[in-house]
Structures are given as C-alpha cells and as structure tokens.
UniProtKB/Swiss-Prot annotation:
Protein's name according to its UniProt entry: K(+)-insensitive pyrophosphate-energized proton pump
Effect the entry attributes to changing G185A: No effect on activity; decreased sensitivity to the sulfhydryl modifying reagent mersalyl
Any one GO CC term of the record: plasma membrane
Record gene name: hppA
Cofactor: Mg(2+)
Amino acids binding Mg(2+) 1: D187, D191
C-alpha cells in the first residue's frame, strides 16, 4: 500500500503546485489603469478585513472545541480537529486572496476580448478549486498515514479522522453563514436604495454600498464555497474510510479498502488538472460550452482513472468482507461511475431550473409583468418544483448502489462525486471574479464594449454559481447519509464488543416508528434546517436594513454624491456589515453542534440509553431529509429569481426600468438570501449534526 499512499500524496501536491503556478501567471497579467487598481484595492482591503476578523472569532470557538476534544478523547483527536480546521481556513483564505486580485486583471483582460477575459477568470477559479481538492485530500491522507505510522488501529485510527472532518465542518458553517450574511446584506441593501429608490444602475460608484457588495461576492461565493466543499470532501472520504474499517474489520482487505477512497481522490484530482487545460473559447464564442468542455474532460479522465484505481487497489474480483460478506471489485467500480453520472445529472437539472434558456426562469420573468406579488408567487412555486428531480436522482442512486454493494457502495458513489470537487469549485469561483470585473469596468467608466464582454462573462458566472450549489447540496445530502450509516454501524460495533465498551451494555437501538422517541427525534431533526434557515434570513434582513439606513444617510448628508462630485464613504458599509455578520453567525452555527448533545441527554434523563440513541439516530435522518429539500428549494428558487431579473434586463418584457423589471428586482431581493445565505449554509449544518453524533458515540465509548 505504500505506493498507493505515495501516489495520493503526490496527486494532492500536484494540485497545490498547479495552484501556485497559476497564481504566478495571474499576478503577472496587466492590472489595468490606476482607477481600476484603486477600486480593486478597496475590495481587497474590505475582504481581508472581514476574513481576518471572522477567522479570529472562529479561532476562539475552535480553541475551546480543541481543548474539550483533547480532554475527552486525547491529543490525536484534538490534533485531527486542528488539521481539519486549519486546512479548511487556508483553502477559503487563499481562494479569496486570489479572486480579489484576479477581478481587476479580468476587467483589464476583457479589453483584449472575450477569450482573454475567460482565460483569466477561469484560471483564478481553478486556483481555488485545486487548493480545495488538494488540501482536503492531503489533510486526510497525511493524517491517516501518520496515524498508521505510529501504530494506531481500531478507534485510535478512526476517531482522529472523524475529528478532522468536524474541524473542517465547523470552519465551513461559519464561513458559509458569515460570508452569506455579509454578501447578501450588502447586495440587498445596495439594490433597495440604489436601484429601487435612487434609480441608479448596479455597480454605480455613487452607491455607498457598492464596494461592500463586491467584497461580499468574494467572501460568500469564493471563501464560503471553498470551505463548504473542502468540508464535504474531507468528511465524505473520512466517513467512507470509517465504513471500510467496520465492513472489512479483521480481514486482509481492510487496508486496501481504506485506501480505495483516497486512490479515487488522487486519480480524479489529476483528471481535474487535465480538464482545466481544455477550457478554451471556440469559434462560436460559447462561454458555457468552453467551461462544460473542461468539466466533461475531467469526468472522462476520472472514469479512466477510476478503472486504474480499482484494478490496482481492490481489484475487480471478489473481496472478502467481515462476517463472511462478499463484495465485488467490479460492483464497487460501477458505484464510483454512478457517482460521476449523478454529478452530471445534478448539474444539468440545476441549470434547467436556473438558466435563462429554460421554462422555469422564463415563467418567473413572465409573472413579473403582472406585478411584484405574482413574481414572488411564481418564484416560490419554482423553488418547490425544483426539489423533485434532484430527490429522484438521489433516490435512484441510493437504491442502485445499495443493490450493488450495500452501504459501502453508497459511500464509494459519494466519494467519486466529490472527487470532481476541484473542477466544480473552479466553475463556482469563476462567478465572483467575473461579477467583480463587471463592477470594476462600470465604476472605472471603461468603454461600452468592455462592459459587454464582462456582462457576457458574468451572465455565465451566475449560472455556474447556481449549478455548483446544486452539486454541493446533492453531495452533502448523500455524504450525510454515509455519516448516518457510520453512526448506525458504530453503534452496532460497540454493542457487539461490549467487553471493550461497557457503556453500551444492554443498549438495543431500533428505528421503529412505533417508538415515540424515534418520532420525536425525526421531528426535532426536521425542524432544525427550518430554524437555522430562518435565523440566516433574519440576519440578512437586519444587516440589509442597517445598510439601507446608512446609504440613505449618506445620500442625505453628503452633498454631491448623486452628481458625482463627492465620494461616498464606502468603508462605513463594509465595517458595519463585518460587525453584523460576525455577531449574527455565532448562535445559528452553534445550533447543529449543541442540538444532538442536548437531545441525547434530555431523552437519557427521561428514558434510557436505548431510547436516547434511537432518538438521536432519528434526528440525524430528520435533518438529512428536510435539510436536503430546504437547501435545494432555496438555492434553485433564488437562482430562478435572479436570472428572471437578468432575462428582463436583456430586453425582454420591457427591459431595464420597466414595471416588470421593478417586480423582478423585488423577487431577486427575496431570492438573494435564499440562494446565497440560508440555502448553502444548510449544507454544512446537516453534516455537523451527524459528525457531532459520531463524536458523542466516541466520547461515550471512551
């Protein structure tokens, strides 16, 4: 296995090396005029100030958790938590660092034409993508190799890896929620006063919230998404390894089966690097086609890589599992291929619901012609409808892979889905860069043809941001299911080895709906995503309200802003939003951490351990089911509202300034926190609840 571990670490380092070289290429590009650099500098300053303050707050929470975990489970678990948290933080920070420097270079590149603008924008996204995949794989592989090297086996090997996933998750939920509150507080506030009240266009330098809006794009869509997918990747690989350690306990195949998800990650990272080389504009100037070509090459190369990984690691023949269960290497390979197919299908479905070429978005645009209310009604209808197809795809994947290889087959499917994370994050991080480039072009008064180029790049960026959210949610839902399987298998393992784990003596867990504790667990789990979403939406409403007041005050008290003779105080909005986002993110983020612990001890106090474990397991299922639907409906609905507004701005139903446009702006304002704050933050929330339950089992077993 030493050769496989070496390959996995080399592949992860190749991704980091690719990122470093690409950063060098981007930074060497022309950064435009002094005015463009001044605007970009303000965005850089705001983004750094926000992330520095956010990470300081997270560090305090992280330090407390580190001490508690180390005290309860030992230093290797505490160290695992630290590795997950630090690597997740680095992925988000470096991604943001490059995107706020690439924006001005994309705007300058757009002066040379569409091809140059696309090249720079995608390269900056690819840096974030490869960092996420490389760091996630490296952190899990490195720590696993280290633990094996010091002779850790059984729980001493598994618990530190679970803690690594928890560290990544904790950073992720803060990054997603804090970044989401900032970005949408700025966006909604800027739109309400700028577009609706003052009647000035988007990204107008006269709007005091315009810099905060551009900062928000980076901390939400770039740093937030990076931390989110880093965490999903790390958690899924860890959960798959946990299941491998249980399903192949005490048999020779255990080492190779624990290495298999790492090998899949390694080959798919190399496939993603290859895919980035194929993102080139063709003769038809089809930007989306160029991006999808890169994605398809990555998926095709991953398919070939998975064939090799399967042949070398488990082999295609029969594999002996624990308790005499037989697995087939070929069936596991099919499960991995299904993961690639599910990724493609989820991306296609999300584009259907959020793209301007399809019925859903056009129906919302048409509804805008009859007023604000009908726009909101149709948007809500689409948000609900958009949950059906992804759920059916996930159901089909679960049943097929379970028939092939049981729960371990499902885990391998999710692992191969996430192995494409590098390319998917690249598509996502492309979005905020092009959005910012458009803003810089507008504020620096660049010629109309440059603005047309940045608009074309940005329109595709809107679609890629929506599409990658669909992928992130689908993989998070399936990943959480793997964590739930790890919870039930852990329970069964502790119960079967009662001599070593006396705390589980007499525990009899079943998830029968005739048990009131199971029903209560389902209800409590089901309400968590709604409560969490409500907290996120309320926080954005409050933050946007304070931005509205501040922008109105500046229009009132600083004469000459509207004439363009006086400069607004941009820093005031950035500072206000930073404070608001950090204050508002703490309590919702602690909800999924504390809920499983509180529920377990409350039910334990009322009944017994069996009832408490049953209620806790049911709660995990409840969170997965409602969380998946809440997240899909919010992100797809918000994306449809946003693109319906863009569709009208392209000249349909009266174009900009028409009554339909005003109604569409209202819908977009409602959809903003839906798709960029509450919806995406439900992802890490689902997984944290599951990981805390796994760690609770480890503490009780300890």
């Amino acid at each position: 296995m030493a050769g496989i571990y070496l390959f996995v670490v080399a592949a992860a380092l190749a991704a980091l090396g690719y990122g470093a070289l690409t950063i060098k290429t981007i930074m060497a590009a022309d950064a435009g005029t002094a005015r463009m650099q001044e605007i970009s500098g303000a965005v850089q300053e705001g983004a750094s100030a926000f992330l520095n303050r956010q990470y300081k707050t997270i560090a305090v929470v992280g330090a407390v958790v580190f001490v508690i975990l180390t005290a309860l489970l030992g230093i290797s678990v505490g160290f695992g938590f630290l590795i997950g948290a630090v690597c997740s933080g680095i992925a988000g920070y470096v991604g943001m660092y490059i995107s706020v420097r690439a924006n001005v270079r994309v705007a300058a590149g757009a002066q040379q034409g569409l091809a140059r603008g696309l090249e720079l924008a995608f390269q900056s996204g690819a840096v974030t993508g490869m960092l996420v995949a490389g760091l996630a794989l490296l952190s899990v592989a490195f720590y696993y190799i280290l633990l094996v090297g010091i002779g850790a086996t059984g729980r001493a090997l598994i618990d530190p890896l679970v803690a690594l996933g928890f560290g990544a998750s904790l950073i992720s939920i803060f990054a997603r929620l804090g970044g989401g509150i900032f970005t949408k507080g700025a966006d909604v506030g800027a739109d309400l006063v700028g577009k609706v009240e003052a009647g000035i266009p988007e990204d107008d330098p006269r709007n005091p919230a315009v810099i905060a809006d551009n900062v928000g794009d980076n901390v939400g869509d770039c740093a937030g998404m990076a931390a989110d997918l880093f965490e999903t990747y790390a958690v899924t690989v860890v959960a798959t390894m946990v299941l491998a350690s249980i399903f192949f306990a005490g048999v020779p195949a255990m080492t190779s089966m624990m290495a298999y998800p790492l090998a899949i990650g390694g080959v798919c990272i190399l496939a993603s690097i290859l895919g980035t080389k194929f993102v080139k504009l063709g003769p038809k100037n089809n930007i989306m086609g160029a991006l999808y070509r890169g994605f398809l090459v990555s998926a095709g190369a991953s398919f070939v890589g998975i064939i090799l990984a399967t042949a070398i690691v488990p082999g295609f023949g029969d594999i002996q599992g624990a308790n005499g269960v037989l697995y087939s290497g070929f069936d596991l390979f099919l499960c991995a291929v299904i993961g690639l197919l599910v990724t493609g299908l989820l991306i296609w479905v999300t584009e259907y619901y959020t793209g301007t070429n399809f019925r859903p978005v056009r129906s919302v645009a048409k509804a805008s012609t009859t007023g604000h209310g009908t726009n909101v009604i149709q948007g809500l209808a689409i948000s609900m409808e958009a949950t059906a197809l992804p759920a059916l795809i996930i159901c089909a994947a679960i049943i097929t892979t379970y028939q092939l290889s049981g729960l371990f087959g499902i885990a391998i499917t999710v692992t191969s889905m996430l192995a494409l994370a590098g390319m998917v994050v690249a598509l996502d991080a492309y979005g905020p860069v092009t959005d910012n480039a458009g803003g810089i072009a507008e504020m620096a008064n660049l010629p109309e043809d440059v603005r047309k180029t940045t608009d074309a790049l940005d329109a595709v960026g809107n679609t890629t941001k929506a599409v990658t959210k669909g992928y992130a949610i689908g993989s998070a839902g399936l990943g959480a299911l793997v964590l739930f399987a790890a919870y039930t298998e852990d329970l069964a393992f502790f119960k079967a080895n009662v001599d070593a784990y006396p705390a589980f003596a007499g525990v009899d867990v079943n998830f029968s709906l005739s048990s009131p504790y199971v029903v209560v667990g389902l209800f409590i789990g089901g309400l968590l995503p709604y409560l969490f979403g409500s907290m996120g939406m309320t926080a954005v409403g409050r933050a946007a309200g304070s931005v509205v007041e501040e922008v109105r005050r500046q229009f009132r008290e600083i004469p000459g802003i509207m004439e363009g003779t006086a400069k607004p105080e941009y820093g005031r909005c950035v500072d206000m939003l930073t404070k608001a986002a950090i204050k508002e993110m703490i309590i919702p983020s602690l909800l999924p951490v504390l809920a499983p612990i509180v529920l377990y001890f409350v039910i334990l106090g009322i009944a017994d351990k069996s009832a408490a474990f049953s209620a806790l397991g049911a709660m995990l299922l409840g969170v997965i089911v409602t969380g998946l639907f809440v997240a899909i409906s919010m992100t797809a609905g918000g994306g449809a509202w946003d693109n319906a507004k863009k569709y009208i701005e392209d000249g349909h139903y009266g174009g900009k300034g028409s009554e339909a446009h005003k109604a569409a702006v209202t819908g977009d304002t409602v959809g903003d926190p839906y798709k960029d704050t509450a919806g995406p933050a439900v992802n890490p929330m689902i997984k944290i609840t599951n990981i805390v339950a796994l760690l609770l089992l480890a503490v009780l077993a300890h």
